Swiss-Prot record:
Family as reported in the entry's similarity comment: Belongs to the CLASP family.
Protein's name according to its UniProt entry: Protein CLASP-3
Ranges annotated as biased composition (Low complexity): 359-372
Region of interest (Disordered), ranges: 356-393, 666-690
GO MF terms, alphabetically ordered: microtubule binding
Source species, domain of life: Eukaryota
Name of the coding gene: cls-3
Length: 983
């Protein structure tokens, strides 16, 4: 009988090699024509989309997919085959999420086969299944975890997109150590396999993820992080050097140990004299010929292999006492003292043969060589034959105090052994001691000990005020202060920062850019008002002390830097700083016509046109543009001369809207005095202007189009009907408007192609033709080739709404839901007016289906709509649906899940304003007779407590039954306990 117990060696684990062997191990499926292939794919989709189907059938169908791909290439072309596979996207996602290990394994093999065969062309499949695959890595069943991890390796290797890297980055803070470990392993693939063009854009994020892995609490994750660092060092040595310097000393030592030599041959080889890149502490540049063996803190002979050529067979004899031991200087700098060494050369050679039994204090020693170790081949050590005066002189330059004068850390005997003998003039001692003091204080400031760091910061305060610091010391202090910004809660750090800037601003031009980047990021991440105010004071000091034009150019360069990718809140801080610089510290009429400013204006317009960030950034972008205009109208006109007409039109409208009535006129350029007056008008207008312009849709209509839900009767379905009518009327206005636009011929051709596809979408009689049109539009949107949003957006949206409401094809509904999500992500601002209608149509698609994959697509689409569209509109439609009498259980459950996602993903600052508005409605929904709705209400309330705090929600909980309050508290405590980091 075969035992059911499996050995611990991992019989059920799989690897990439196992997957590759099974790729084509599938039964042959005969395919006669393209229609036959499509019918077979439809049959596969029907079985895989049903999660309650027998798992053996689903496993067989996944093998059939591979067989269809292998044997269908002779029947259809490559794009058609990819279109068939994209239609199975929901099925693949459902299979990867399956709890049955056989189904998951087969799904992982099939998806790996697809992405390895078609690569970037199937990026939509790889991007969508990467998240569930990473989730399965955390499963305790080994076959499931290894199958999922192997699938992620295939996806990361063959689908090289920014979206894949963004998904991976989201798992860096996972509570599961298996996911963090897998992320570190995938980083090694990213570094070795991805193209340099993509890696250049994300190199800073890659380094941060490697740093996080090296500092992880899990030992295996740290080991994987070190392997990723080794690969980074191999492929991109400069970035590896910079990352190395950011690590703690203990982590540097771990990385350093891997680079060390481990044999006598490596120490004495010519390669041993090659300079090791800057992985040494300060002062290491004077010893660039040291072998890497000493960096691993191991002892070895000090005899230079080149010096032995001159010494011949005789070797220097060193004393046995460590207090009187002298070192031979083998560095180039030590050649100055060759005369000093030659004074004792003959005496040292004789001492190897002549004992001194009668010398006071001398001792004889016999040595026996019983080992072949390299250390035993060193010369026999005897007592020094030199006079006592000479011994004292040698002790002066050989003991530990010598290292303090060099500014080197006296950590081990090996470090002491590496240093040459240098006789310094007594006149230079004060300078050496001052340099040693600065180095020692900086070392304390970067210490991992909290108390030592605090003492170092206190000592640093008088040092930064010293005007006699040399350029190297100023550079080291500046770098140290930038690192200390992570502990900006210590107000003394910011005070030292301000003093340092005031004292040495004329010598910190190159340092300014990095300092501003650190300060912007720190202020954006800070939540304490007092600390944020202190950081603002430090920024004001920089504004006062540096040249205004130099600051302007530096800020614009930082804004466009592809390496320092700032988070949205940091961009807000940068724009506020830029506005203050232009308004308060730049003289009216000053020249601003520079290429850096022209690039910065383009970058600001890009930020403002991003639908995810427009609400946050657009008001600040408008302020910065108006401030530039007020400084020098003529230069500003020249800066925007290369922009397209739509961007110029938007800038002109922005200037008029903010009090600059004349805008930019080619016939009437304002004078400097007029610019000053305009600036005052602009500042006054900004205080009155609402900060929610939303979208820089260049040339788009800005009228108020909000839907007033307060007057709607929510006792029946009339509310939803009225919402749809208002949204539809606005859409029809856009359709009529777009039909009158004059366009160039190439754009007209694109529009005609899209119009033909839209017409096919409307023909519900031919389901196959409709499905083909939907697939074509979806592929165009995924590949970024749609390109005619302005003219076809409204018509496409109406077609999607009609299919979601009336179509009987579940596959068409799922494709339309994915298209709607892509449209919302790419052009969210165009969907603002139709928010309520979009949510209603998506809910209709969910209510009229029994397909599990359609339900998943509905939840994903609602999540996208909720996080990209106006928050007030989302809350209003949620209230309408939850307040219906009687409550629609299925719609209410989906809406509650949507609100839960809102509170899980959006920042607390945005959500605080809607808590009082939505909470009573959610609590009322708990009265539903459906257990599913009640459970969803509890999850939603728990998410609200976790995001805005228990104190904020307490007034609403007083109206709840005690049992429900206790239940919520249990879930909150459970969420808190699971969010704690694992040790």
């Amino acid at each position: 009988m075969t035992s059911r117990m499996q050995p611990k060696s991992g019989v059920y684990s799989v690897s990439k090699a196992d997957f590759t062997k099974i790729f084509e191990d599938v039964p042959k499926v005969p395919i006669t024509s393209a229609v036959d292939l499509r019918n077979k794919f439809d049959a596969v989709r029907i079985i895989l989309s049903n999660s309650s189907e027998d798992w053996n059938k689903r496993q067989t169908q996944l093998k059939t997919v591979r067989s269809l791909v292998i044997h269908g290439e002779k029947v259809v072309d490559r794009p058609t085959m990819i279109a068939h596979l994209v239609q199975l996207l929901g099925c693949f996602e459902l299979a990867v999420k399956d709890l049955r290990s056989q189904v998951l394994r087969e799904a992982a093999i099939t998806c790996s086969f697809i992405v390895s065969k078609y690569g970037i062309e199937t990026h939509s499949i790889g991007e969508d299944i990467l998240v569930p695959a990473m989730s399965q890595v955390a499963v305790s069943t080994k076959i499931m975890a290894t199958s999922a991890s192997t699938l992620t390796e295939f996806i990361v290797e063959y689908v090289q997109t920014r979206q894949v890297f963004t998904i991976l980055s989201s798992f860096s803070t996972s509570k599961d150590k298996s996911q963090r470990r897998q992320l570190a392993a995938l980083l090694e693939i990213v570094i070795s396999k991805w193209s340099d063009r993509i890696k250049k854009q994300i190199m800073r994020q890659i380094c941060e993820l490697i740093k996080s892995a090296i500092n992880d609490a899990d030992s295996e994750t740290r080991a994987a992080g070190r392997r990723a660092f080794a690969k980074l060092d191999e492929m991109h040595s400069e970035e590896a050097d910079a990352l190395y310097l950011e690590l703690d000393h203990s982590k540097q030592k771990m990385l350093r140990g891997g680079d060390a030599a481990s044999s006598w041959a490596s120490v004495n080889s010519e390669k041993g004299s090659i300079p090791i890149r800057s992985k040494l502490s300060a002062g290491s540049k004077a010893h660039m010929n040291i072998s890497a063996k000493f960096l691993a803190q191991r002892s070895a002979s000090a005899i230079d292999p080149k010096a032995t050529k001159f010494a011949g067979p005789s070797r220097l004899v060193r004393p046995t006492s460590t207090k009187t031991m002298a070192r031979q200087d083998t560095s180039p700098a030590g050649c100055k003292y060759s005369n000093f060494i030659s004074m004792f050369f003959k005496t040292l050679l004789l001492s190897a043969k002549i004992p001194y039994p009668n010398r006071p204090g001398s001792r004889t020693r016999t040595s026996s060589i019983t080992s072949t170790d390299s250390r035993d081949t060193s010369p026999t050590r005897r007592n020094s034959p030199l006079p006592p005066e000479t011994q004292k002189a040698r002790v002066k330059y050989g003991n530990g105090s010598f290292f303090a004068k060099l500014g080197m850390p006296d950590t081990t005997d090996d470090d002491e052994f590496l240093l040459p003998i240098r006789i310094r003039s007594p006149l230079k001692t004060p300078t050496i001691e001052a340099h040693d003091k600065v180095s020692q204080v900086l070392k304390e400031c970067c210490s991992s000990s909290v108390s030592e760091k605090k003492e170092g910061i206190k000592k640093l305060l008088p040092i930064v005020a010293d005007t006699s610091l040399n350029p190297i010391e100023i550079k080291n202090i500046g770098n140290c202060l930038n690192r200390l910004l992570s502990d900006a809660s210590n107000t003394m750090v910011l005070e030292i920062y301000s003093i340092f800037v005031r004292t040495h601003s004329s010598r910190l031009s190159e340092w300014l850019r990095l300092a501003l980047a650190k300060l912007f990021a720190r202020k954006a991440a800070e939540t304490l008002p007092n600390t944020k105010k202190q950081i603002g004071h430090t920024l004001n000091v920089i504004l006062e002390c540096f040249n205004a034009h130099h600051q302007l150019v530096t800020v614009c360069e930082l804004m466009c830097d592809p390496i320092h990718l700032m988070v949205p809140k940091a961009r807000v801080v940068l724009l506020e700083y830029l506005t203050s610089l232009l308004d308060e510290y730049t003289e009216p009429g000053a020249s601003i016509n520079a290429k850096e400013l022209k690039t910065a204006i383009r970058k600001m317009l890009t930020w403002a046109s991003d639908p995810r960030l427009s609400i946050l950034l657009t008001p600040h972008v408008e302020k910065a543009i108006c401030s530039m205009f007020c400084v020098n109208v003529a230069d500003f006109s020249a800066l925007i001369s290369d922009l397209d007409s739509e961007q110029k039109n938007w800038i002109h409208q922005t200037l008029q809207r903010n009090g600059l009535e004349n805008g930019i006129s080619s016939n009437n350029i304002a004078t400097n005095s007029g610019a000053t007056a305009s600036r005052e008008t602009s500042n006054t207008s900004f205080q009155k202007e609402s900060t929610s312009f939303g979208l820089p849709e260049f040339g788009a209509r800005k009228g108020g189009t909000g839907v007033n839900l307060g007057s709607l009767n929510i006792s029946n379905n009339l509310a939803l009907s009225r919402l749809e009518e208002q949204s539809t009327s606005r859409l029809m206005e856009k359709v009529n408007l777009n039909s009158t636009v004059t366009l160039p011929p190439d754009t007209l051709e694109k529009i005609q192609n899209v119009q033909d596809l839209l017409q096919k979408m409307r023909s519900s009689e031919n389901a196959d033709e409709q499905e083909s049109a939907i697939s074509s539009i979806y592929m165009m949107i995924c590949d970024g080739g749609f390109g005619v949003w302005e003219q076809c957006y409204a018509k496409l949206l109406l077609n999607l709404f009609e299919i979601l409401s009336k179509s009987r094809s579940e596959n068409n509904k799922k494709m339309c839901l994915r298209i709607l999500g892509k449209m919302c992500t790419a052009q969210a601002a165009k969907l603002f007016d139709s928010t309520e209608m979009a949510v209603c149509k998506v809910l209709d698609a969910a209510v009229n289906t029994n397909d599990a994959t359609t339900a998943l697509a509905v939840e994903d689409c609602l999540r996208t709509l909720a996080t990209h569209l106006p928050l007030s509109n989302i809350i209003n439609i949620a209230k309408v649906i939850l307040n219906q009498e009687p409550i629609d259980d299925e719609r209410a459950s989906l809406v509650l899940k949507m609100v839960t996602r809102l509170f899980e993903e959006l920042p607390a600052e945005e959500l605080n304003n809607i808590v009082d508005d939505i909470t009573p409605t959610i609590i009322k929904a708990y009265q539903s007779t459906s257990s599913t709705v009640r459970k969803t209400v509890v999850y939603c309330l728990v998410a609200m407590v976790n995001r805005v705090g228990e104190q904020r929600m307490t007034p609403h909980f007083t109206k709840l039954p005690k049992a429900m309050t206790n239940l919520i508290q249990v879930y909150v405590n459970r969420a808190i306990s699971t969010s704690l980091p694992r040790l």
